[in-house]
UniProtKB/Swiss-Prot annotation:
Pathway: Amino-acid biosynthesis; L-lysine biosynthesis via DAP pathway; (S)-tetrahydrodipicolinate from L-aspartate: step 3/4. It comes from Nitrosococcus oceani (strain ATCC 19707 / BCRC 17464 / JCM 30415 / NCIMB 11848 / C-107). HAMAP family: DapA. The record marks T44, Y107 as: Part of a proton relay during catalysis. This is 4-hydroxy-tetrahydrodipicolinate synthase. It holds the Pfam family DHDPS. Pyruvate binds at T45, I203.
Length: 292
């Protein structure tokens, strides 16, 4: 249903933490102009944990309104409360989002049966395409491939963002689910391999700052052209590393500030990128000719 380079969009903020609506609209246009295939808003990179519910919903609406159908908009609507996730997913549907991204419930660490019933309840309650999001390093809870296969039988669960670097797990999901569910990488460093084994794209942090390059890498990888994909991927590796020098989205927001696209705002408990990483990130941006 969705494919290619899907940017995990940051949520621009002013230095005092207020949301920067002009900056958000500017980013949407930047991605449309530079070949991004879809926008994923208010996910991990979009700082959803520190947004108020009304802010969360308004960000979705602003992105949808600015996109004007020029590319798909996927809204992060996951929560560790099933009821809250249903409410956010319904709000995203009403706002005009094309699909929703639902993270595995964090902190309360449900069983596999609890995970199955959680996602099943949301899918049955809200008729919008839904993409599962497994990121065990953040949630302390792992959605196993066997549970993904059960969920793939639900018609509006259409994909999974697998944020691990485990290529064998990606293959297992594809084998268990077949064409019932699309696989997306949630780790930039593993994205190329995920697509070469049959994944449909990546939900990418790096695409925030290098949208053309990530789009080009996805295009050739989806065509099965390993040589061309590896050439771009190898070139991007220093940028992948620099963008995770501190926890995401700290480095990518600083990079976008350096590029002149957003203000230097981030909400506590996250903080602005430590000065010791500034030159590392500048060098990676210069190497990709993003900065002069």
């Amino acid at each position: 249903m969705f494919h290619g380079s899907m940017v995990a969009l940051v949520t621009p903020m002013h230095p005092d933490g207020a949301l920067d609506w002009e900056g958000l609209r500017r980013l949407v246009d930047f991605h449309i102009e530079n070949g991004t295939d879809a926008i994923v808003t208010v996910g991990t990179t979009g700082e959803s944990p520190t947004l108020e519910v009304k802010e969360h919903i308004r960000v979705i609406r602003e992105v949808v309104d600015q996109a004007q159908g020029r590319l798909p908009v996927i809204a992060g609507t996951g929560a560790n409360s099933t009821r809250e996730a249903e409410e956010l997913t319904r709000a995203a549907l009403e706002a005009g989002a094309d699909a929703c991204l639902l993270v595995v419930p964090y902190y309360n660490r449900p069983t596999q049966e609890g995970l199955y019933l959680h996602f099943k309840a949301i899918a049955e309650a809200v008729p919008i395409p839904q993409i599962l999001y497994n990121v065990p390093t953040r949630t302390a809870c792992d959605l196993l491939p066997e549970t993904v296969a059960r969920l793939a039988d639900i018609s509006n669960i259409v994909g999974i963002k697998e944020a691990t670097e485990d290529i064998a797990r990606g293959r297992q999901i594809l084998e268990l689910c077949g064409d019932k569910l699309d696989l997306y990488s949630g780790e930039d460093s593993a994205a190329m391999e995920y697509m070469l084994i049959g994944g449909r794209g990546t939900i990418s942090v790096t695409a925030n700052v290098a949208p053309k390059a990530v789009h080009e890498m996805c295009t050739v990888a989806l065509q099965g052209n390993r040589k061309a994909a590896e050439a771009i991927n190898t070139r991007l590796c220093p940028l992948y590393a620099a963008l995770f020098s501190e926890v995401n989205p700290i480095p990518v927001k600083w990079a976008l500030y350096e590029m002149g696209l957003i203000a230097q705002g981030i909400r506590l408990p996250l903080t602005v990128l430590s000065e010791r990483y500034h030159e590392l990130l500048r060098q990676a941006l210069r190497q990709e000719q993003i900065l002069q």
